[in-house]
Amino acid sequence: MRFLLLAAFVAYAYAKSDEEIRKDALSALDVVPLGSTPEKLENGREFYKYFFTNHQDLRKYFKGAETFTADDIAKSDRFKKLGNQLLLSVHLAADTYDNEMIFRAFVRDTIDRHVDRGLDPKLWKEFWSIYQKFLESKGKTLSADQKAAFDAIGTRFNDEAQKQLAHHGLPHT
């Protein structure tokens, strides 16, 4: 039964147009807006506080911060900057989804900036479900359409990411 529900969910996600997926994803991001006010600048760092608390096994990818706690993240200028870069990247991925050429170029650029970090290639897909859970931790109730949108973005993102990893001769799935 679970398989049938999952299959129906995936079929529904792919039945939507790229523009609909874009709109659904962007509407989910209203809980973490971009901006220059102190509270908006904190949104990116909030992701890393969530991430370091709930995915401690992945802290190993952050050299010098492997033992950081959420309190350490809250005081870190490094994670303020990284958080805002990540938040911008998620918004860009969502906002360019309906322009596949630009979306895929953005993914390749993202991979190019991470080639020396030794990331497990499966993380490029897993990130999107982690990000959904982060949004939910901020009080956002994601609709089925919004979840499907992030799944579609994650699938396309991962597809291009794996191609770019292979291009660099790096492990890929």
Swiss-Prot record:
Domain Globin: 25-166
Sequence similarity: Belongs to the globin family.
Keywords on record: Heme, Iron, Metal-binding, Oxygen transport, Secreted, Signal, Transport
SUPFAM superfamilies, A to Z: Globin-like
GO molecular function: heme binding; iron ion binding; oxygen binding; oxygen carrier activity
Function: May be a globin and may play a role in oxygen transport.
Listed name of the protein: Globin-like host-protective antigen
Entry's localization field: Secreted, Extracellular space
Pfam families hit by this protein: Globin
Major localization listed first in the record, in broad terms: secreted
Gene3D superfamilies given in the database record: Globins
Residues noted as binding heme b in the record, renumbered to the chain: 114
Secretion signal span: 1-15
Cellular component per GO, a single term: extracellular region
